[in-house]
Amino acid sequence: EALADPIADPVAGPNPEADPEAINLKAIAAFAKKLLG
């Protein structure tokens, strides 16, 4: 988790036991949606 992208942290949500890779994918998707509108 310490190596994760800082941008992913607030997007990951309150479930620290979730798959880190899945969280990262969701974070990237959410960030992309914010960038693309």
UniProtKB/Swiss-Prot annotation:
Free-text tissue specificity from the UniProt record: Expressed by the venom gland.
Swiss-Prot/TrEMBL keywords: Amidation, Antibiotic, Antimicrobial, Immunity, Innate immunity, Membrane, Repeat, Secreted, Target cell membrane, Target membrane
AXPX repeat start and end residues: 4-7, 8-11, 12-15, 18-21
Pro-peptide positions on chain: 1-22
Record keyword Repeat present: yes
Main location: secreted
BP terms from Gene Ontology: defense response to bacterium; innate immune response
Post-translational modification Leucine amide, affected residues: 36
Compartments, record wording: Secreted; Target cell membrane
InterPro entries: Mastoparan
Keyword Transport: no
Disulfide bonds: none
Annotated phenotype, changing residue 35 to F: In MpVT1; important increase (4 to 8-fold) in antimicrobial activity
One Gene Ontology cellular component annotation held by this UniProt entry: other organism cell membrane
Job of this protein: Antimicrobial peptide with potent activity against both Gram-positive (S.aureus MIC=50 ug/ml, and B.subtilis MIC=25 ug/ml) and Gram-negative bacteria (P.aeruginosa MIC=25 ug/ml, E.coli MIC=3-50 ug/ml, K.pneumoniae MIC=25 ug/ml). Exhibits little hemolytic activity on human erythrocytes.
Family: Belongs to the MCD family. Mastoparan subfamily.
Protein name in the entry: Mastoparan-VT
